[in-house]
Amino acid sequence: MDGNGCSIGTHILSYKPKSVRSDRDLEPQTHRAQCAPPPTCERGNAFPAKPRAILVRMDIKTRNIATHAADAPATAAPTPVVGRFAPSPSGRMHLGNVFSCLCSWLSTRSQGGSIVLRIEDLDDRCKRPELATQLIDDLAWLGLEWDEGPYYQHDRLDLYEDALRQLQDAGLTYPCFCTRAELHAASAPHASDGTPIYRGACRDLSAEEVARRSALRAPATRLRVPAVDDLANDVIEFVDRTYGAQCEALATECGDFLVRRSDGVFAYQLAVVVDDAAMGVTEVVRGCDLLGSTPRQIYLQHLLGLPTPHYAHIPLLMSPDGRRLSKRDRDLDLGELRTRFGTPEALLGWLAGQTGIAPDTTPRTAEQLVEHFSWDVIRAHRENITVTAQ
């Protein structure tokens, strides 16, 4: 049990917010690739406790290690929509981050839902309190209000540890000693998110070999995925609200993946799954560069007996020279944008017009943009969007 009232033994869903704030909110992400045809998700529907059309070919009963969720009634009453903003304080927000946050906020508010703000600061480069404070100030300036939080991942390590222990106790993990250089040197094919597909070099090491290697360097921890011939479990299918039907064979298109790095930092896939469930998130809106992470997260959700939210990935914003906007390159960062536009209404109105959310670039508040927002519009503009300075 952590300070938020979250328990991760056999389940993670007893969440009680330790504080409720009515400041302002957002979650940055700005990415996008090209994916698939539009889905038919209805606005306002939330997945019930037992996801139905998400894992079409995954036999939950044979691999779920927390069966309470798998046994939940499929006809449970719809739950309130809960969206989230999950920025990483690795630098100043840029325009792509603002776009991601805006879409998440508009989608949730258009369904009468609430927003959770979570600061994803597990990585050392994100442990900069001054950047987290700046990020929160920027979200407040934009007028995107949140209802719970901010919560910080560095305060939630016990939850991730408990989830990892469940996987370990079920025999689903193993120590991996492969270095990043070794993985890239193997010239292995890459997963959809650019990481090398792991071919299982450390999967079947003997106890003696594990002990020998552990004396030399700390291992990472990998999660086993179903074997390629395990057709009942290997293929993950889901429907993305923007890009439609998605399908991934874990063994051949992903491989066993990290749940904890060798430096002890919990992997993004595990932490985000635990947090989304604990916070009751029913809708995840984020950049399309994270579309490839979704099958791994759904696999983890089912192993841990957690609900699967709706997923909606959005286009990436690109610079005129074809580059993806990035914090590192300080592309259209919010400091510059605040100076240039002067007011949040001017910035949001211009962004909404550039991305097709609104019919023009008339200055508008976030609240005024709710009536213009539609996932049909996002689907119609699902290719990368090139933006130019005002």
Question: Model segments located where?
Answer:
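N-terminal Rossmann-like or analogous alpha/beta NTP/dinucleotide-binding catalytic cores
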Residues: D59-A191, C288-D289, S293-L306, R364
